C-alpha cells in the first residue's frame, strides 16, 4: 500500500480548502506523505497571529465581496485569486522536511522551463532584467509528530489587486501581531505565456512522484464530494466563523475621532478576541449624555460594524431629541470599523 496521497480540490472556497487541509493534517497516519493542490477565489489569507484590521483594507474587501481566511500557520497576509496555485505538503516526523518540499516545487518549475531559486526563509524567486522577482511564498506548521509546508505559486494573479486589499486603511490602530512584509512579485505567465493551473498541478504532482519513486491516483474533492474526514463539519464551521477569522486577532486599541456640526467626538476602544473590553468617550458636545451612554453600551460588543450600529440605533429610544446626532454617530462608527 502506497504511503503517498494526492488530493486536488475542485472548490474555490478558501474556508473549505483550509478546513480540508486542517482535517487531513490532524488525522493522517504519521507514515503518510500528502500533497494537496488547491486554489481560492478572491480571498485575503492572513497568518495565525495577524490582525486583519491592521493588515487588510477590510472596508474595501467587504465592498468587493473578498473573503478573509485565517490559516493555522504563521507568516504574513496574501491575496489569493484564481491566478494563484496553492500547494500543501504534509508528512509525519522525522520524514517531514520543508527542504524536500521546496526542492519538489523547484523541480516542478524547472520541468516547465522556469529556473527559480529559494530565497530567504520562505520565498522562491526568478531572475529578471529588473532583478529578482518573487513567484512563490510559503508558510509552515509543526506539531510534535508531523508538519506541513504550504504556499502559493503566482501563475496569472491580478497583481494590481494585491495593493487594493493588503494596504490597510489609515485607521488609528495601536495593534500587536505579526506585520506582513511586502515583496516585489511576478507571475509565471510573464515567463511562460499560456501556462495553466492544470499544467502547474501536473508538474508539481509529477515532481512529488519522482522524488518518492511511486505514484498514486489523484483524489478530486469538492463540497459535494469530500473524503471521509472525521469532524470535518466542525472544522469547516470554525474555519468559516467570524470568531476565528476576525476574533482571533491579537489585542489592539482603536481611536476614532470626528467633528460633527454639534461637536467633536473621540472614541477609544480596547479590543480583545474581537470584543470591545473597554470604551472611553471624549466630546465637547453641549449634551454629552448620548455619547456617554453609547460608550457604556458598546463595552462587551463584538467589534463588527453591524453590531455597533445596532447598539447606536437602540439608544434613539432613550434619547429621541438627539436622534439625528445618534444617526450620524451610528453611520460614522459603522464605517470606521469596517
From Swiss-Prot:
Binding annotation for (R)-lipoate: 134
Which reaction is catalysed here?
Answer: L-lysyl-[lipoyl-carrier protein] + (R)-lipoate + ATP = N(6)-[(R)-lipoyl]-L-lysyl-[lipoyl-carrier protein] + AMP + diphosphate + H(+)
Q: Give the E.C. number(s).
A: 6.3.1.20
Instruction: Answer whether the UniProt record assigns the keyword ATP-binding to this protein.
Output: yes
* Stored Pfam families: Lip_prot_lig_C, LplA-B_cat
Its family remark reads:
Belongs to the LplA family.
Role noted for this protein: Catalyzes both the ATP-dependent activation of exogenously supplied lipoate to lipoyl-AMP and the transfer of the activated lipoyl onto the lipoyl domains of lipoate-dependent enzymes.
Q: What is this protein called?
A: Lipoate-protein ligase A
The uppermost taxa in this organism's lineage are: Bacteria, Pseudomonadati, Pseudomonadota, Gammaproteobacteria, Enterobacterales
Q: Miscellaneous notes for this chain?
A: In the transfer reaction, the free carboxyl group of lipoic acid is attached via an amide linkage to the epsilon-amino group of a specific lysine residue of lipoyl domains of lipoate-dependent enzymes.
Q: In which pathway does it act?
A: Protein modification; protein lipoylation via exogenous pathway; protein N(6)-(lipoyl)lysine from lipoate: step 1/2; Protein modification; protein lipoylation via exogenous pathway; protein N(6)-(lipoyl)lysine from lipoate: step 2/2
Where does the chain bind ATP? 71, 76-79, 134
A GO biological process of this protein is:
protein modification process
